[in-house]
Amino acid sequence: MDGRAVAPAAGTVLNALATGVGSAFALDFDVEATVSLEPERESVSGDIADHADADTGLVERCVALATERYGDGEGGHVRTDGEIPLAAGLKSSSAAANATVLATLDALGVAEDVERIEAARLGVQAARDAGVTVTGAFDDATASMLGGLTLTDNREDDLVVRDEVDWHAAVWTPPERAYSADADVSRCERVAGLADHVADLAAAGDYGTAMTVNGLAFCAALDFPTDPAVAALPHATGVSLSGTGPSYVAVGDADGIQEVATLWNENPGTVRETTTQLTGARTT
């Protein structure tokens, strides 16, 4: 019983750490999950390609929850591989959870029978169980699972808005890593007033302004430099720290994003030029 699926990375419009309301959008690079189920096996094991020491508790929990709910509690093995750097603010955990849940449903033969948003909720529950998220990250999960841009209330796992956005994007990932579960939530809560304003902007469809206000606020709250965002502003529709960092994402038209990428390439780390993604997670 084998299944395989991919799910995209995502960037941030609104970080949910301040109020529980968040917004994110899918980016066109993926993580892939391959799941092999064994009916006679009770446990689940996992590995992450090129990261032998990485914690696989999240993806193992995804398999277990999916087989408990939609199968007969089968055990097995899950392997993830892909282009999304770990602990970089690009929603690698949400993408891995989405891909793993879909791959497990594929292995069970029910991938087309389960609504995508319910599959995303299953991955969010696994993330909470595994302790890799503060807010549940339903915004990140829905953006990656459904594609496009989503605005969510993570306190209720409620999808408020889904919209399709057609942007070019530049992604700068510095060499350091930051784990969202380690973020200083109390400092983030101090920018709740700005976060409410960002949510209003996003709900009104002013995504670029929302993203930029979020970026400046959460750079301050999480102690990241604003210089990369300020450098990008003349060329971008919107720019923000992504998640809890350290990556920054700028969106806009092709020429503007090429200018941003050129500027960001002067910094250490890696710069990727990509686009938004509208189809979300899918079996392969």
Where are the predicted features?
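Short beta-strand-to-loop capping motifs
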Residues: 37, 174, 250-254
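Alpha/beta catalytic cores of group-transfer enzymes, especially the acyltransferase/condensing modules
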Residues: 117-159
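Short glycine/serine- and small hydrophobic-enriched flexible loop segments
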Residues: 64, 101-109, 200, 216
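FAD-binding core of FAD-dependent oxidoreductases
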Residues: 12, 18, 87-97, 127, ...
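ATP-binding N-lobe of GHMP and related small-molecule kinases
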Residues: 1-85, 277-284
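DPxDG-like acidic metal-binding loop motif
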Residues: 90-118, 145-147
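Acyltransferase
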Residues: 163-225, 233
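Glycine-rich, charge-dense phosphate/pyrophosphate-binding loop(s)
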Residues: 204-284
